[in-house]
Amino acid sequence: MAKATSSLVVPIIFLVIFALVEQNTGCFDYDVYQPCDHCRERCLKYYPVTRKAICRKNHCVCIGPCPNDKAIPNVKLFKNVKEQILS
């Protein structure tokens, strides 16, 4: 009986760890079929301004917080869009 109990301890520990630990990674959204021309404008068109546009392997990538992260005020979304596009 003791052997059966001890064989359940390790799986239970892993279940508890996976249930309590939250993965903290940024969200990546790949725009696979389009080259890097005007990557920042494309990211602003589909995602909030908190996303960063970079070019990886000739593909536009928008990196930023996950959608379920803190809410983004609408004022920041539309304020100085021209500056954000040019940056």
Curated annotation (Swiss-Prot):
Q: Does the keyword Signal apply?
A: yes
Looking at the keywords, is Secreted present?
yes
Could you name the Gene Ontology cellular component terms for this entry? extracellular region
Q: What is its main location?
A: secreted
Ordered alphabetically, the record's keywords are: Antimicrobial, Disulfide bond, Fungicide, Plant defense, Secreted, Signal
Provide the leader sequence positions. Answer: 1-23
Localization terms from the record: Secreted
Its GO biological process terms? Answer: defense response to fungus; killing of cells of another organism
> What protein does this entry describe?
Defensin-like protein 175
- What is the protein's species of origin? Arabidopsis thaliana
Lineage, top ranks: Eukaryota, Viridiplantae, Streptophyta, Embryophyta, Tracheophyta
